[in-house]
Amino acid sequence: MNIMKILIIIGLLFFAFYNPQDPEDKTSVEEKKEVAVQPEPKPVPARKRFFTTRNVPAVNNFDTKDAYGQIISRCRTPQLDNQRMTNAHESTHFIHSQLRNDDVLSRRVKTFPGAFYIFPDKSFHIEQPKFLRKEIERYIPASLRFSRFNTYFGRNKSWAEYPLYIIDEFVAYINGSIVALDDHKNGQRVDSLDPMVGPIEFAVYSVATCMAIKDLDPEYWNNQEFQDFMYDTMKKSESIFKAGRNIYPYKNQEEILTNLKTSPDAENIRAFMKEHFDSFFLSID
């Protein structure tokens, strides 16, 4: 009888302490659930950028076989008495003027509009922000005020009520540089010493314009089409600069690039470019 009791007690103790898990496996069921491999999250697709454009048809019989001809053919009163790059730049301004005038005459807008010719055959139209052009200056650090600064800022009071005047110039410099690159490819002489300075210098001034818009007219900045137009224009400017930088080397363009990437007083410009313009220019070696 005593032996039977002893066997029963031994059996109960065996089942009380028996663990069928691997003796080396100390992980609880709950912990195993936590360390289970999770599926990789699906990447969020990039937002498709979009801004409304209009067609800009040819208005004369100028030969459109090259970039120069594409621009000149869309201008009712083109400039033709200077070097081709300068003619393209100035004729871009004239195209902008005819686009604005057409908007006013057709009563598409209530105030003086901004209108920008996008090479080779499109345009983007938008009204002006609600502040004076001089407000942009404080967003341009001293290290990034180069040769064209005094021409378009400082004592220059023309177009004072139109901040997008800076973008007007930016687009004109881009188009002039497009012609310089195309002419080089086609064996056409290019007389300018600095065809690539305009795109990078005015990229800086245009970023400053966007910074001013964001601070001084946030409702305007929240117009996604304007942001997308500026993104597209900045991207084009960087592409042109990279393509022509070594073809047309010039000291100022390298100083602008270096200061943009490294100067302490340009930190706000860099931060804005990283946030809104995919760090264009900042990753160029």
Model-derived segments and spans:
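Sec-dependent N-terminal signal peptides
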Residues: 1-21
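Sec-dependent signal peptide cleavage junction
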Residues: 20-45
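Non-catalytic accessory regions used for complex assembly or targeting
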Residues: 37-66
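Short pre-active-site segment immediately N-terminal to the catalytic Zn-binding motif
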Residues: 71-86
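Active-site recognition of the HExxH zinc-binding catalytic motif
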Residues: 85-101
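Post-HEXXH active-site segment of zinc metalloproteases
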Residues: 98-145
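Extracellular-facing segments of soluble proteins and assemblies that are Gly/Ser/Thr-biased and enriched
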Residues: 142-185
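Pan-zinc metallopeptidase signature
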Residues: 174-285
